[in-house]
Amino acid sequence: MSNESIKAEQDLIQEGVESEVSTAEASLIDELTQANFRIEELEQLLAEALAKVEEQKDSVIRAAAEVDNIRRRAAMDVEKANKFALEKFANELLPVLDNMERALMGTNPEDEATKSIYQGVELTQKSLLTAVAKFGVKQIDPQGQSFNPDQHQAIGMQPSAEFPANTVMLVMQKGYELNSRLLRPAMVMVSQGGPNQESATIDIEA
């Protein structure tokens, strides 16, 4: 075979190889282009999915916060309702306790004719005070204590050699408080002190 024939055959082979390479390159470029398009589509779908997840997350957080607020408001409403009901009950109970107190004051525990009545009323009063104490109702009996304007209401002042100045010398009506909040002040007579004591003055409410 002549040199020209060999060269011609080599040229044909080279052209075939170049054609196949060119076709393969074109196919590869097309596949890469399609892959890039697919990647962009997937990235877009992922971004949309993440946005929806974030939106749903915010919705869940807002819903949880709203539920928590509703629970707190409901608990506060229940607490207020219970407090109002308990305060109303306690105020309605005060006349009953006052009547028991007056019954004890009007009965002589040393008199055999009224001794059993006194003991019965006293026992009932103690039982009632013990029962209401469980709900926060406490009696204010400041006999012999220093006058406290936050808990006591003075109806008058009198000189006294027995009680120091500004001391409760007589409780006219006992007071009551509910969970440390004043329901009714104790009505008291306050000592001005004796001749050898420094006299005291306080504001007396009508």
From Swiss-Prot:
GO terms for biological process: protein folding. The keyword Acetylation does not apply. It comes from the Bacteria. CDD domains: GrpE (cd00446). InterPro entries: GrpE, GrpE_coiled_coil, GrpE_head. GO terms for cellular component: cytosol. It is found in: Cytoplasm. Keywords: Chaperone, Cytoplasm, Stress response. GO terms for molecular function: adenyl-nucleotide exchange factor activity; protein homodimerization activity; protein-folding chaperone binding; unfolded protein binding. The keyword Chaperone applies. It holds the Pfam family GrpE. Homodimer. Participates actively in the response to hyperosmotic and heat shock by preventing the aggregation of stress-denatured proteins, in association with DnaK and GrpE. It is the nucleotide exchange factor for DnaK and may function as a thermosensor. Unfolded proteins bind initially to DnaJ; upon interaction with the DnaJ-bound protein, DnaK hydrolyzes its bound ATP, resulting in the formation of a stable complex. GrpE releases ADP from DnaK; ATP binding to DnaK triggers the release of the substrate protein, thus completing the reaction cycle. Belongs to the GrpE family. This is Protein GrpE. It comes from Shewanella baltica (strain OS155 / ATCC BAA-1091). The gene is grpE.
